[in-house]
Amino acid sequence: MLARFPLYLRLVRMDKPIGSLLLLWPTLNALWIASDGHPRWPLLVIFSLGTLLMRSAGCAMNDYADRDFDRHVKRTADRPLTSGKIRAWEAIAIAVGLAFVSFLLILPLNTLTKQLSVVALFVAGSYPFMKRFFAIPQAYLGIAFGFGIPMAFAAVQDTVPTIAWVMLIANIFWSVAYDTEYAMVDRDDDIKIGIRTSALTFGRFDVAAVMLCYAVTLGIYVWIGVTLGFGLAYWAGWAAAVGCALYHYTLIKDRERMPCFAAFRHNNWLGGVLFAGIAAHYLLAGS
């Protein structure tokens, strides 16, 4: 078992934390806004660990669902499950185990948060199969990656206000943007194996679609900033996020694999500066 542990870590992408961070930033945004900038540390621990565990469970489930496709894709052919280094039942067991531990984390929280966690589990578990028939599975991914937002509001306020759902919509558009960049890397392979992705659905308008999704995301955060009366610190973070989006355009405009992958990874900075703006606003407002 110990000899297989490094393979299990690779299965759940512990060597690639970018996915966990893309889940974490919007969840932290929600925790800070829901608590007026003073989130309780137990909630920070629960949601941070839950984000890591559920993303890891999702990776294991995704590799199980895509095991017959991934062997035909250059980037994924050497994944532990695809290459036969671990078995399918092991991936399922790991996914179920991690999801169960995630549920144990939220047991101290209120009933509404637990109810929302059931929905979140269903969305996360069903996402890997969306690529079979949904033309833009990245939108469904945005729901899965963003469901920590309504859960955070529920945990803090015992209700899910309108702003939480608006933030979730922003996260859906952001997810379509960065995961389309990711899909642009595998475009040729995905055409051969018949998988549906937003990069293929958007076709020659893929770059325009990515930038439009960034515009909608950042436009929604303008509404959030104005509605909540955020100050200059927030707008500095927002402006930095705009700069990130414009930088991504320079990377993806020629549709080359490695620059598109670099743009995807750089979304960690976009999410990070948005959160930094929110946190800085509350920090300065309370000083």
From Swiss-Prot:
Reactions catalysed according to its record: all-trans-octaprenyl diphosphate + 4-hydroxybenzoate = 4-hydroxy-3-(all-trans-octaprenyl)benzoate + diphosphate
EC assignment: 2.5.1.39
Subcellular location per the Swiss-Prot or TrEMBL entry: Cell inner membrane
Pfam annotation, one family: UbiA
Cofactor(s) needed by this chain: Mg(2+)
GO biological process: ubiquinone biosynthetic process
GO molecular function: 4-hydroxybenzoate polyprenyltransferase activity
Transmembrane segments: 41-61, 89-109, 133-153, 158-178, 202-224, 267-287
Topology class, membrane: Multi-pass membrane protein
Cellular component terms (Gene Ontology): plasma membrane
Keywords: Cell inner membrane, Cell membrane, Magnesium, Membrane, Transferase, Transmembrane, Transmembrane helix, Ubiquinone biosynthesis
Cystine pairs: none
Pathway: Cofactor biosynthesis; ubiquinone biosynthesis
Role, per record: Catalyzes the prenylation of para-hydroxybenzoate (PHB) with an all-trans polyprenyl group. Mediates the second step in the final reaction sequence of ubiquinone-8 (UQ-8) biosynthesis, which is the condensation of the polyisoprenoid side chain with PHB, generating the first membrane-bound Q intermediate 3-octaprenyl-4-hydroxybenzoate.
NCBIfam families noted in UniProt: ubiA_proteo
Protein name: 4-hydroxybenzoate octaprenyltransferase
Natural source organism: Burkholderia lata (strain ATCC 17760 / DSM 23089 / LMG 22485 / NCIMB 9086 / R18194 / 383)
